[in-house]
Amino acid sequence: LHKAIRRQRQMCIRDSRQPLYRYLGGIDLEMPQTFHNVINGGEHADNGIDIQEFMITPIAKTSFRDGFEKIVNVYHTLKKVLEDMGYETGLGDEGGFAPNMKNSEEALKALHESIIKAGYKPGEDIGIACDCAASYFYNKEDGKYHLEGKVLTDDELAAYYDKLLDEFPELMSMEDPYDENDVEGMVKFTATHKDRIQIVLDDFICTNPALLKKAIKEGAGNASLIKLNQIGTVTETLETIRMSRKNGYNTMISHRSGETGDTFIADLAVAINGGQLKTGAPARSERVEKYNRLLEIEEELGKGERLAFFPDDVDHD
């Protein structure tokens, strides 16, 4: 797919003589809501945190640049907070920190403190999201979730998530809160939480229109994670985006681990109008290049560019 993307970009430049985001999206464009992975756990880290990613997202912003600057401030403040707590601050593959914490509550407390120390209000200026990647701690033999020293049923896992949501109301989005094969758990959680948080489907749908159609019919999730090189073609990727929007699902364009410096997803996130973008922390060159591209696009669009706002202003057209 990366080769197809490069060919498409070359054709766009040669034939249309316009930026890729305009070629893909026309004139109805919107700068994306970005989600930045800043603390790693699960398979991405060797620590006591079973939830895989903790992200921050700019809620209050006057421009894309303004929101990104807020994220950078919180990121650097988090580094200092972790150092003061006695944790090492080496960077993982996606630019996030992997402190040797005991559990997810510690990670959320560190983020909460960092947002405040950076001069912002949790839940008003900066929100938190997480990729639970529940398949990592789901035990197929007993059908339960082995999470940070606890063995939990579907309902007990929901109660655990409720505890986090009550303690940290700035937690606004959860990706893959249940195992990809635990349809009953995911559907039940969606029914009780869809009006409270964004529930993002990744492993559950794999950017596959057929799997998304099944999830919609079952009532699972309210947002789709879109990975460009997961389904195999740009056409199928765009079909998954269209189906999501048609059925009221938010869309989050995502990087992959082992990401390259290719910036196509930045153009696509703008082109699909009102999408969200998950592409790592504001660190490491392959991540920063995508944010630099978004800043370039904002400059090209000029003053008055439209901004996607989360969670209250998502365009499903």
For every predicted segment, state its role.
Residues 53-64, 88-104, 133-148:
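Active-site-proximal beta-alpha loop/turn segments in soluble metabolic enzymes
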Residues 1-13:
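Single conserved hydrophobic/aromatic residue that forms the stacking wall/gate
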Residues 84, 105-317:
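Catalytic core of soluble alpha/beta enzymes
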Residues 24-30, 39, 60, 205, ...:
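Acidic, glycine-rich active-site loops and adjacent beta-strand->loop/helix elements
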Residues 29-92:
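Mobile "lid/hinge" segments at catalytic clefts and subdomain interfaces of large enzymes
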Residues 2, 44, 255:
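Histidine-centered active-site/metal-ligand motif
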Residues 21, 25-40, 121-134:
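Glycine-rich, aromatic-flanked loop segments that form ligand/cofactor-binding clefts
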